[in-house]
Amino acid sequence: MERFRPLLNKVAMGTALNRDEAAYAFDKMMSGETTPSQMGALLMGLRVRGETVDEIVGAVSVMRAKMLTVDAPVGSVDVVGTGGDASGSYNISTCASFIVAGAGVPVAKHGNRALSSKSGAADVLAALGVRIDLAPAAISRCIAETGIGFMFAPTHHPAMKNVGPTRVELGTRTIFNLLGPLSNPAGVKRQMVGVFAKAWLSPLAEVLKALGSERAWVVHGSDGLDEITISGTTDVASLEDGRVHTFEISPEDVGLTRAAPEALRGGDAEHNAAALRAVLEGAPGAYRDVAVMNAGAALLISGRAASLRDGVDMAKASIDSGAAKAKLDQLARATQALAPQVDA
């Protein structure tokens, strides 16, 4: 711990940590070797100054090293958000995940229960009859057999229990809100990550580049959504061929109609489960349109689609053919069957 105090002093002076220093600090915190005061001081010092790319890379590398991993096919994708956008939207990325899987791209979905919203990915999946408490080996089998699997964050990141109480006591956003979406237990190399603030677009794309991602989009809607929105434009930082570039997209680009922000709002887990099921069963409207736009982007990132419009067309076909709904049914059945294999 002799090295930790000097790092605290560095942060207190407003000086950035290098990648190795950040990794050391987060290893000590996640191993339970720091006091709550030390942990809180470091987290708030980083938050006030603003976390750097190297600090996030160092922290994520530790989180990934400590996680319980899952095997997934090469080419698997994840569609995930940081949360914290206060939008109250329905579970867009979860719905999009079934659409992507229905289009033939394996999905290794990583998520949690609601932290700042009424319904997180885990909550809505449980309401849809999906068991979220599978052991890593069972999830690997689930993805292999059905083309989609859900990894419940607390199961795969046991070291987080050492920082959880301090995060709750702080009661404000910290670097850990960024680390979860960047720490997929299946090690996917292609992902779409939604963020709660536009300022994080390019930095998180650079983090993904440093951590070995092949292709990724980091997105933020003009309405504040940590997804691609259809109520306005969406800013994108795209990682492709080792380069990050930024651009803006709109629903009109792919033939979709804008909707009011209220049209994307959801409710509790039961409400959102019914909405998600309705979309997969072919119901028209804003819920469908925002899901197919997000799924279309994921299909582009995966390499299955040649353009965003092509991806949106594939996403629509995934729903209209019944393939997306079939993935939900397959996931529910597979997780129920595999549930007895859960570790005691």
Swiss-Prot record:
Pfam families: Glycos_trans_3N, Glycos_transf_3
Residues that, per the record, bind anthranilate 1: 81, 112
EC id: 2.4.2.18
Listed pathway(s): Amino-acid biosynthesis; L-tryptophan biosynthesis; L-tryptophan from chorismate: step 2/5
Record flagged with keyword Transferase: yes
Record-level Gene Ontology MF annotations: anthranilate phosphoribosyltransferase activity; magnesium ion binding
GO CC annotation: cytosol
Organism domain of life: Bacteria
Cofactor: Mg(2+)
EC class: transferase
First and last residue of the signal peptide: none
Biological process terms in GO annotation: L-tryptophan biosynthetic process
Keywords of this entry: Amino-acid biosynthesis, Aromatic amino acid biosynthesis, Glycosyltransferase, Magnesium, Metal-binding, Transferase, Tryptophan biosynthesis
Cofactor binding mode and count: Binds 2 magnesium ions per monomer.
PANTHER family: ANTHRANILATE PHOSPHORIBOSYLTRANSFERASE (PTHR43285:SF2)
Assembly: Homodimer.
Function statement: Catalyzes the transfer of the phosphoribosyl group of 5-phosphorylribose-1-pyrophosphate (PRPP) to anthranilate to yield N-(5'-phosphoribosyl)-anthranilate (PRA).
Full protein name: Anthranilate phosphoribosyltransferase
Organism expressing this protein natively: Azorhizobium caulinodans (strain ATCC 43989 / DSM 5975 / JCM 20966 / LMG 6465 / NBRC 14845 / NCIMB 13405 / ORS 571)
Lineage start: Bacteria, Pseudomonadati, Pseudomonadota, Alphaproteobacteria, Hyphomicrobiales
Gene for this chain: trpD
